[in-house]
Every structure is written in structure tokens, then in C-alpha cells.
From Swiss-Prot:
This is F-box only protein 8. The gene is FBX8. Gene3D superfamilies: 1.20.1280.50. PROSITE patterns: FBOX (PS50181). SMART domains: FBOX (SM00256). Residues 35-80 form the F-box domain.
């Protein structure tokens, strides 16, 4: 009697298990494969998907979770997003400034165009008024100065970073001076740096010329440090070129002598080469005081 009852109980339990198994199989068979959602998406696949989305959509996904916010803000993802070949043509920005009234400026951004030989610009009302005299663009960042402070603006995230001023300069604490900033990138270590030149001359002939070179590494807790104290005194030009981790710009040591300065962003080493000229030529020089015309 006891054995028969035990056997019946075991058989009943087996039937329940088989019934549950068949029910799960039926539900899977009825499920539409088009609406099936995977429980887990590998991170590398997730990154590949996100890098092919428009920038505005990527910024919205930062609100999904802390993990997504950290992922989309990571340096790896930002670099990956820049090199994906399927991304649309990047926007071009233009700033128009009234030379007689620096408080009047107009920011334009490129609009979609059907012709590869022309550009169409519209007024961009999404970017805040930035000001400044010179705008520099590097890897999607807009760099400018206002009130003698260096500022970096990300047009994709609408984030603005204001860097501290140089407080230990011997020139800034004295008479009127010229100050000019350059933004550059180290592709080996993937680091951004600012090079600042502070210069002073008593007249247009660059008499009593003095200059200083300062570097700021864009990282948490970064600060200005003075470098190359033995570098020749000079007045830099606002024309510069970033190429393969090296910053190039022109500088004047006197009204008739111009040199090409190269700055290795990674090693922070400077090199110079005199610009060739014919006898008697006077090289053009930037207008005195133009670099500190900021507001």
C-alpha cells in the first residue's frame, strides 16, 4: 500500500514537469522572433551600435543608467565615435565678428547641402554666445578666450569649461602685455594640452622684448606650469597648425626676424627654425596688442 502510494506520487510529479516543459515550448514557438529581446548585449556590440547613432541620440542615452552615462563619457567611446566611417559629414562652424564692436558676433553652422562644391551656413541659435577674438578648432572642440581666460566648448554636449588664469607670471603682474593660447593634442597618450605665450615689448620695434611659455594639461587637478625658461624671447603669431602631435606657429624676435616654432606635445620640447627671406625684406607682424582684445 505504501509503495503504491509513493509510486503514484512520483508519476504525478513527472507529469507536472512534462506539462510545464511542453507549455514553455509552446510559448517559445508562438513568440515572434522579430520581437524577441536578448537578455544581455555584449559591450563591444553595444559600442558599435551607439557609435553609429547621431550625436543628439547618444547624448539622450546618457540618462538610461549610470553605466551608460559612464560608457558614453569615456575617452575610448569618444575616440571611437570620431573615427567611425559611417558618421555623417561633421558640421562646420563660422564666427563673424564686428571689428569695430567686439560685443557683436554671429555664429553660423553648416547646413545639409546637395552640392559637394559649396557650403550652406545657417545661424546657429543652439550655441551660447562665446565672444573672444580668435577661435581655434581641434578634434570637435572649440577653443577661445574671454576676459583673458581660456575656455573650451563642446558643441555636441553643450559643455563649457573655463580654465584658471596664470597667477605666477612676472609679465602679467607688470605693464600691458600680449597673451595667446594654443590648444594641442598628444595622440600617443590621448591627452590635450594648452600652450600659453605671454609677451611684452616696450614699442612697435619690439624693444625690451620679454616672453614666457606656460603649459596646462587638461586633466583633473591640472594647473599651469612654466617651461623652457631659456627659450628666446618672442612675440607669437596667431597662425598655427596641429599635425601628428606637433604644434607649429610663427614667432618674431625682432621686426626683421621670424622663426618657425615647433612644440612636441608629448615630450614638451621646443625647436626653432629661422624663416628664409631675401635681403631687405621686412616680414609682416601681427598688430600690436591684437591678441589681448578679448571681453
Amino acid at each position: 500500500m505504501g509503495f503504491s502510494f509513493l509510486l503514484a506520487t512520483v508519476q504525478k510529479e513527472r507529469m507536472k514537469r512534462r506539462s510545464r516543459t511542453r507549455s514553455r515550448s509552446r510559448r517559445r514557438a508562438k513568440q515572434d522572433p522579430k520581437t524577441w529581446v536578448a537578455r544581455y548585449i555584449p559591450q563591444d556590440l553595444l559600442i558599435e551600435i551607439l557609435t553609429r547613432l547621431p550625436p543628439k541620440s547618444v547624448m539622450r542615452f546618457k540618462c538610461v543608467s549610470k553605466f551608460w552615462s559612464s560608457l558614453l563619457s569615456s575617452r575610448y567611446f569618444c575616440n571611437r565615435f570620431l573615427i567611425v566611417p559611417s558618421q555623417p559629414q561633421p558640421s562646420l562652424y563660422m564666427c563673424l565678428l564686428d571689428r569695430y564692436n567686439y560685443s557683436k558676433s554671429l555664429i553660423l553652422s553648416s547646413a545639409p547641402s546637395t552640392s559637394p562644391y559649396s557650403f550652406v551656413f545657417d545661424q546657429d541659435l543652439t550655441i551660447r554666445k562665446m565672444g573672444g577674438f580668435f577661435l581655434r578648432i581641434l578634434r570637435g572642440f572649440i577653443f577661445f578666450t574671454r576676459n583673458l581666460k581660456a575656455r573650451i566648448y563642446n558643441p555636441t554636449t553643450r559643455q563649457l569649461v573655463i580654465l584658471p588664469t596664470i597667477k605666477e607670471s612676472d609679465i602679467i603682474a607688470g605693464p600691458p602685455y600680449n597673451i595667446l593660447y594654443f590648444i594641442c593634442h598628444d595622440p600617443v597618450n590621448d591627452r590635450y594640452k594648452l600652450l600659453c605665450t605671454v609677451s611684452y615689448a616696450s614699442d612697435n620695434d619690439l624693444q625690451n622684448l620679454k616672453s614666457e611659455l606656460w603649459i596646462f594639461v587638461l586633466e583633473a587637478g591640472g594647473s599651469w606650469k612654466r617651461v623652457a625658461n631659456e627659450f628666446p624671447h618672442h612675440v607669437p603669431s596667431h597662425l598655427d597648425l596641429n599635425m601628428n602631435g606637433v604644434l607649429y606657429f610663427l614667432a618674431w624676435t625682432d621686426p626683421h626676424t621670424c622663426m618657425l616654432v615647433s612644440f612636441d606635445v608629448r615630450s614638451e620640447e621646443f625647436n626653432t627654425m629661422q624663416v628664409p627671406r631675401n635681403a631687405g625684406d621686412t616680414l609682416p607682424r601681427q598688430e600690436k596688442g591684437v591678441v589681448n582684445r578679448v571681453w
